[in-house]
Amino acid sequence: MPGIVELPTLEELKVDEVKISSAVLKAAAHHYGAQCDKPNKEFMLCRWEEKDPRRCLEEGKLVNKCALDFFRQIKRHCAEPFTEYWTCIDYTGQQLFRHCRKQQAKFDECVLDKLGWVRPDLGELSKVTKVKTDRPLPENPYHSRPRPDPSPEIEGDLQPATHGSRFYFWTK
């Protein structure tokens, strides 16, 4: 029925939250973007194609799981340099990277040595990429209405207007 909205149950919505501040997320953003690229792009593709967030709950859970695993690995292997780095970002006035290059270098070195992750080059994560997915295409990906016939047949005889044209003052 078109007027009834089916909402997901609370069990379907239950996930562990990623409880971090903006400075922590900003400090880890480059490595997070490289490590969780596929789940994030799968989720965004699902959201764009489906136009309904309820249909993308599984992809959203995978994004959340990837983020939690990422921050657990950072905490396990590089907690001290990462804490120094995000604390520096947090205490600079506008959360700018340029004031914290020494801490960033220590963090990047730790991540490279212990996890084997290379910091992506500037602009690498913003390149347009094709996403290979196993999800089937939606039936109507643009959610467009059916188009009317371009030239419908006119029903009945058309009579001229009884009181003349709307643009009468233009014709005299």
Curated annotation (Swiss-Prot):
Region Disordered, as annotated, extends over: 133-164
Q: Which GO terms describe its biological process?
A: aerobic respiration; mitochondrial electron transport, NADH to ubiquinone; proton motive force-driven mitochondrial ATP synthesis
Q: List the disulfide bonds.
A: 36-66, 46-56, 78-110, 88-100
Positions occupied by motif Cx9C motif 4:
100-110
What's the chief localization of this chain?
A: mitochondrion
Where is the protein localized? Mitochondrion inner membrane; Mitochondrion intermembrane space; Mitochondrion
Task: Map motif Cx9C motif 3 onto the chain.
Answer: 78-88
**How is the polypeptide modified once translated?**
May contain intrachain disulfide bonds, as evidenced by its electrophoretic mobility under reducing vs non-reducing conditions.
| Cx9C motif 1 (motif): residue ranges | 36-46
Q: What GO cellular-component annotations does this UniProt entry give?
A: mitochondrial inner membrane; mitochondrial intermembrane space; mitochondrion; respiratory chain complex I
- Pfam entry (one): CHCH
Transmembrane intervals: none
Annotated GO MF terms: NADH dehydrogenase (ubiquinone) activity; protein-containing complex binding
Q: Which InterPro entries match?
A: CHCH, NDUFA8
Say if the entry is tagged with keyword Mitochondrion: yes
Q: Which residues form a coiled coil?
A: none
Topology relative to the membrane, per the entry?
Peripheral membrane protein
User: Which purpose does this protein serve, as stated in its record?
Assistant: Accessory subunit of the mitochondrial membrane respiratory chain NADH dehydrogenase (Complex I), that is believed not to be involved in catalysis. Complex I functions in the transfer of electrons from NADH to the respiratory chain. The immediate electron acceptor for the enzyme is believed to be ubiquinone.
- Please give the record's comment on domains: Contains four C-X9-C motifs that are predicted to form a helix-coil-helix structure, permitting the formation of intramolecular disulfide bonds.
Q: Which protein are we looking at?
A: NADH dehydrogenase [ubiquinone] 1 alpha subcomplex subunit 8
